[in-house]
Amino acid sequence: VAFYFSDGDGGEERITYAELQRASRRIAGEMLRRGLVGHRALLMFPPGLEFVKAFYGCLYAGVVAVPAFTPRRNRNVQRLQAISDDAEASVALTVADVRDRAVGMLDETPTLQTLDWLAVDELVGDPGDSDAMPTMRPDQLAVLQYTSGSTGSPKGVMLSHGNIMYNVMAIVYSFESTQTGLGITWLPTYHDMGLVGGVLKPLYFGRPNVLMSPMVFLQKPVRWLRAITKYRATVSGGPNFAYDLCTQKITDEEMEGLDLRSWQVAFNGAEPIRAATLADFCQRFASVGFREEAFFPCYGMAE
């Protein structure tokens, strides 16, 4: 198994490496058929495995991936248009449900209207011919990663194939002690920590990863720690606020059944790290096997 997608309450989907390769190449083949090599693709997916298939489909096809969020009828549609305009996107990759719901919102966003919308879950047929896939160089653009835009318009950062490989290699080197383990992330894949740590690093590492929706964690933080317990995860983490949320929201009753002894790397980054947060989390969860030395403060693309 390459990736799991957990609903946080016991349900899961899974995809093997072979299935992921076939699905990604099928998407790549369709983009090659449409002549999209070198173009920018806006990726707008709900949490799940379809994003992973589409993202690797872009890498196969030599299409620049632009991870983004799904459109909603509020300010976020305007932010999507700003990203699409800046990236000069020509195609939108998504699933049929999101595409159909987006139709009524596009009147205010002429740029999004002109995109070639491709629902990857409707594609059928054989995977694309591997001989037709372009050969990529390390210096070629792979991803346009956009900032959150919390202080203004989102800004795109150009990440080459070489940039990404070097970053992933550095993470793997740092997490060397967890080579036999499995990871879990609830972080959104359109942010760099969720994309690199949750989608790219696991495949390079050759270890499975469990994906969860951010809302699954935010609505009930104990689901994160229950997933670590269930899957015996060795690597998982998030921004500082996630550890505060666990300490503050998880009740004594919810603590029952947790077992965090497998957790070897609890990374913490993407925002300021507070010593009090680490101390409080350790004190709260030591009784269920969390070890202080598991904490791994880090910084990456966001910083």
Label every model-predicted segment.
Residues 3-56, 72-81, 133-135, 156-162:
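Conserved AMP-binding/adenylate-forming core of the ANL superfamily
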Residues 165-182, 189-234, 249-253:
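Conserved AMP-binding/adenylation subdomain of ANL enzymes
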Residues 77, 85, 97, 105-119, ...:
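Conserved adenylate-forming
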Residues 117-118, 122, 126-146, 152-153, ...:
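Conserved pre-ATP/AMP-binding loop-to-beta segment of ANL
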Residues 41, 58, 92, 141, ...:
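Conserved S/T- and glycine-rich ATP-binding loop of Class I adenylate-forming
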Residues 48-71, 82-91, 181-182, 200-210, ...:
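A short helix-loop-beta submotif of the ANL/AMP-binding
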Residues 45-49, 63-83, 96-98, 207-228:
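ATP-dependent adenylate-forming carboxylate-activation enzymes
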Residues 1-15, 142-144, 151, 300:
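AMP-dependent adenylate-forming
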